[in-house]
Amino acid sequence: MTVLKNDRFLRALLKQPVDVTPVWMMRQAGRYLPEYRATRAKAGDFMSLCMNPELACEVTLQPLDRYPQLDAAILFSDILTVPDAMGLGLYFETGEGPRFRKVVSSPADIEALPVPDPERDLGYVMAAVRTIRRELNGRVPLIGFSGSPWTLATYMVEGGSSKDFRKSKAMLYDNPQAMHALLDKLARAVTAYLNGQILAGAQAVQIFDSWGGSLSSAAYQEFSLAYMKRIVDGLIREHEGRRVPVILFTKGGGLWLEAMAGSGAEALGLDWTCDIGDARARVGGKVALQGNMDPSVLYANPAAIRAEVARILARYGAGSGHVFNLGHGITPEVDPAHAGAFFEAVHELSAQYHR
């Protein structure tokens, strides 16, 4: 077992005592960093970067080299690697985001989808995890991740990004049996994928339910949360002599925190529309919380960033069980110095809550 030099991220997820509130940031390896842009240019395009374990490792480590305050690394990859491995043919259209060459539109299409084997069909991701773990050498924990079944299904049925999820929701209401068949297959695929990452060295995993908040309350419970619970139930929960915590993040899921707290996950990610103090009261100590500063605060000056960090820390209050993060990913236009001011403020201002 690798001895972790800094395990406060894992300790906070398990609500164990920490000296300061740990911090990391969704999309911390990303386009706001000039060093990331240079490595991406070297790779040629986004998917070539994802599929090269050495370059994926390089960009994963870049934010840690720049910001010594970071308490976790997150695997550099994309949620759509799973549908790509199911044969849909992922590509990126400039200005339009991800697209698939094949779409899923019928029960026959769903029946034909394979459940990918992580080592055989997504071996480049597993190789990246192993490479990153080796290079981290116990510096901080490594987070693995996947998209949720519902979120992946929307891309597969729409053929890419969507504003209204028209085709996905039409299938959900017109042919719920077909949607359940797709989600069942995706739940099996995601479980295998995350377990593959854990065996390769991921020390915590996050399920990104980016589009769960687009659903009605009843549909969320049936078509998103139920399948995430199934994944949590199927995950390897102890590896290398440690608990492997699971973080469940539904963007727009603030109405359903009580239900999410019963998922079996150790922590819930919050977007910035929730008040973290209210969220803490609502989940009643069942889970840790991650979040939840509005990413747009990073456009403001460092004093304003510091003030918002102070406000969120005060709303959470004393004790462990909080991992500081943004409420969604950092945006490409942010000044890297502002991200640094954010990380510094979290560590400096949170110590008083852990005495």
From Swiss-Prot:
One GO BP annotation of this record: protoporphyrinogen IX biosynthetic process from glutamate
Residues noted as binding substrate in the record, renumbered to the chain: R27, Q28, A29, G30, R31, D78, Y155, S210, H328
InterPro entries recorded: UROD/MetE-like_sf (IPR038071), Uroporphyrinogen_deCO2ase_HemE (IPR006361), Uroporphyrinogen_deCOase (IPR000257)
Cited PROSITE patterns: UROD_1 (PS00906), UROD_2 (PS00907)
Primary site of residence: cytoplasm
Pfam families: URO-D
GO molecular function per UniProt: uroporphyrinogen decarboxylase activity
Pathway(s) where this gene product acts: Porphyrin-containing compound metabolism; protoporphyrin-IX biosynthesis; coproporphyrinogen-III from 5-aminolevulinate: step 4/4
The reaction(s) this protein catalyses: uroporphyrinogen III + 4 H(+) = coproporphyrinogen III + 4 CO2
Keyword tags: Cytoplasm, Decarboxylase, Lyase, Porphyrin biosynthesis
Protein's job: Catalyzes the decarboxylation of four acetate groups of uroporphyrinogen-III to yield coproporphyrinogen-III.
Subunit comment: Homodimer.
Listed NCBIfam families: hemE
Record-given protein name: Uroporphyrinogen decarboxylase
